[in-house]
Amino acid sequence: DSVYVGGSMFGARAYANNFSEEELLEAIDYVHLHGKKLFMTVNTLLKEQELEEKLYAYLLPYYKRGLDAVIVQDVGVLRFVRKHFPDLPIHASTQMTITGIDGAKFMEEQGVQRVVTSRELSMKEVQQIAEHTNVEIESFVHGALCYCYSGQCLFSSFLGGRSGNRGQCAQ
């Protein structure tokens, strides 16, 4: 019932054919026309200069068009979005490495609507988080499984000079 997309910046799939601004705005309209939701990724680590000079202008057109949620990794981005777009729902990315109840509760306290749990968790661990928090829970059940904990990668950078934390995973 929802579509997940990456835009032209700050997504963990830097080498993918991501949406341009025009395409993403059209996608928001199209998805809403069919009664569905669109969630956009901002799931990399941002530098201070990027937060101050780029993130607001990047998110603003999508926010105005009715973006349903932003998926974030960086707690600085979470704080920034909460401050500048207070009614925009935020989802904590699997890249945020939420591995337990306390992490999920902390995200809940920060106003996060949904936690995408770490891919490395068992079904029982995910169930425990769901039973002890009030946030929506989402989990990956297939796909890539990183050598490191998701969102904590230094391996790609070490081996290939490409930062997985900036969307350039060597996987």
Region spans (language model):
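Active-site pocket-lining/capping segments in soluble small-molecule metabolic enzymes
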Residues: 1-98, 116-120, 125-171
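Conserved nucleotide-cofactor-binding alpha/beta core module
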Residues: 100-102
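As written
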Residues: 111-112
